[in-house]
Every structure is written in structure tokens, then in C-alpha cells.
Amino acid sequence: GLAAGGKDPFAPFAGAGAPAEAHTPFLRVGSSEQLDTILASAAGKVVMLDFYADWCVSCKEMERFTFSDPRVGEQFEKMLLLQADVTANNAADQALLKRFTLFGPPGIVFFGPDGRELAGTRVIGYQSAEKFLVSLGKVRNRAGAAPVRAAP
């Protein structure tokens, strides 16, 4: 379990003989400057920036229960997914958090095709897949894209 080196409190024996599950394909962002470079070259896509840390239980819940939902995955295919891993809480991590006035993870910031943050679309704390689909619908509406249906 966790005492044997498992890092996920929801799956303390993960990796102990079972294949690892597929993870959401986030591009890691390590600094504010790197984020600006990526946003400038995002080719008109909506961008999602997920603030994550290994010690953040709600972050693990988002990965396990929300991001893994096929309906969420379908919406992710239409976005550029970025992740700022602030586990180390170093100067670059703190600068990124401060830039978006976040105290820590979990926090998700969305940017429109123009590279600017989409006002009123931040997700702070855990959201179930159902609630997150509603949040993604708001993001798409603000970005001028077709609305997302929450129900299958």
C-alpha cells in the first residue's frame, strides 16, 4: 500500500502487479514564461491549465473520477491540455500560482483561442464529471464554440 511506496491514496496498491491506467495527455508547464510561449502558439485552440500536486487529494480525485470520464475525454480532445505540477512549491511554482491568484491546487484556468483567460470559467476544488461537463460547457460558450451536452 502507501507504506510500500504507493503514491495514490485511492489506489495504494497501484503498480503492484497491475498495469497502470492511461493518464490524460497533459503537457507540463514549468514556468510563467513557458506558459506564455505555449499560449502564443496554441493555434486558436481553447487551452486548459490544470494546477496539480502529488500531495493534493482533490487533484487525485479529479484525475481518477473526473478526467477519466469518457464524456470529459471527448471534450478534452478539442482542447490543448496543460498541467502545472506545483508539488515542489519552488519559486517558479509560486510565481505561476501568484499570477492567477491561486493559493494552491486544485485549480483550473481556461484560455480562449486568443490566448486570454476566459472570465468566469475557473474551476477551484474537486468537481464530479457531471459538474465538470457543465463547467466545460460554460468554457465552450465563452470561447464561442458549440455547447456541450452534460447527459449522454
Region spans (language model):
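Proteins that catalyze or organize thiol-disulfide redox chemistry
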Residues: G1-L80, A84-P152
